[in-house]
Amino acid sequence: MAKSKPLQIGKVSIGGKRPAFILGPCVMESEKFVWRMAKRIAEICATADVDFIFKASYDKANRTSVRSFRGIGVREGCDILSAIGRDLKMPVTTDVHSPKEAELAGEWINMLQIPAFLCRQTDLLRAAAETGRAINVKKGQFLAPWDVRNIAEKLIAFGNSKFCFTERGTTFGYNNLVADMRSLYWMREAGYRVIFDATHSVQRPGGAGDSTSGDGVLAPALARAAMATGCDGIFMEVHENPVRALSDGPNQIPLKDLPKHLRMLKAIHAAVS
């Protein structure tokens, strides 16, 4: 299959000559927090001369424990993201979990993200597609890379070809994932635009009993491997203080380390392009 044309989301091109980055905290911990993170990441990316889409979740709907923090809700979250995108002049993305959420988020959000566990939910895919927005589908931990063809066929049948896939690891026994770099090759070979999610790929699902743990120290290494293997962009969740993060702290990259990781990833992309 011929390679898809670049997917343009605001000023960011996924599948173009420059690598795209999707960056931001796991969850909106508060309005002040998400604004602070957006501004700081924007400054870092401007200095590094990289193109990025700002990501933050308004609801973590699949938390391991009922006691875990989930977020601030779809309406408030989308209002905040819309304002960030408008005022800071950057495209924004967030994940949607139901057809109704897709419809609501589609009014404000540049790119809708389909969670990995929901990647085959036809009604959700239809609702997201019918917004006309770009769609980033997280490949389920249970799917082979060639199985994304069925998801692509659904989205195209629903009238939307503005989508990409994100590799975020494959189930590897209990409480563990493995990042198979061959997946990037096979999905791109099939003609799809492909992002690599470095931080979720190092998760240990349920590894802390009532929450997910992970090996965040490995996320930059996997990002470098993915860029060298060949992908259209890198997804990384970052936090100003991962130890105190309200969700996915063990996997997020410290904000202070983001500049050096971006420099390295840009250099690798230049070397293999």
Please name every model-derived segment:
Residues 54, 208-273:
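C-terminal alpha-helical cap/extension of soluble enzyme domains
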Residues 71-73, 87-101, 110-123, 134-145, ...:
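Catalytic beta/alpha-barrel core
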Residues 10-28, 57-67, 193-208:
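N-terminal small/glycine-rich loop or linker at the start of catalytic domains
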Residues 132-238:
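Catalytic alpha/beta core domains of metabolic enzymes, predominantly
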Residues 18-22, 51-55, 91-93, 110-111, ...:
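Structural preference for beta-strand elements that scaffold enzyme active sites
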Residues 1-21, 79, 270-273:
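N-terminal amphipathic alpha-helix/helix-capping segment at the start of soluble metabolic enzymes
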Residues 39-48, 67-93, 128-134, 184-194, ...:
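Alpha-helix-loop-beta-strand connector modules within alpha/beta enzyme cores
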Residues 22-34, 52-74, 239-249:
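Glycine-rich, proline-tolerant flexible connector loops at the mouths of alpha/beta enzymes
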